[in-house]
Amino acid sequence: MAHKKAGGSSRNGRDSHSKRLGVKKFGGEAVIPGNIIIRQRGTTWHPGVNVGMGTDHTLFALESGAVTFNKKANGRTYVSVNPITKAAE
């Protein structure tokens, strides 16, 4: 007897949800402690001054201030937060 698979949908048509990675706060933007600066896979950007790194390599602010990106001689890009100093009253 001749057999044929039942006509079904194609085997394609699946995809994963986007992970919304990337820079969330750009250079010069103000941040407060806990603000996420960058979501990444691996260490494309490295934490600098006043920046912490989570277990999933997310970079976040430890102090209030402005975000800066610095490229060092070793080829790595470091993300730092420069604190905003208030004038003495």
Swiss-Prot record:
The cross-references to Pfam families, in alphabetical order and at most eight, read:
Ribosomal_L27 (PF01016)
Listed disulfide bonds for this chain?
A: none
The biological process GO terms on file are: translation
Record GO cellular component, one term? cytosolic large ribosomal subunit
Q: Which UniProt keywords apply?
A: Ribonucleoprotein, Ribosomal protein
Q: Where is this region: Disordered?
A: 1-23
Does this entry carry the keyword Ribonucleoprotein? yes
For this chain, one GO molecular function annotation is:
structural constituent of ribosome
Q: Which domain of life is it from?
A: Bacteria
**Listed InterPro entries:** Ribosomal_bL27, Ribosomal_bL27_CS
Q: Does the keyword Oxidoreductase apply?
A: no
Record's family?
A: Belongs to the bacterial ribosomal protein bL27 family.
Q: Tell me what this protein is called.
A: Large ribosomal subunit protein bL27
Which organism does this record belong to?
Mesorhizobium japonicum (strain LMG 29417 / CECT 9101 / MAFF 303099) (Mesorhizobium loti (strain MAFF 303099))
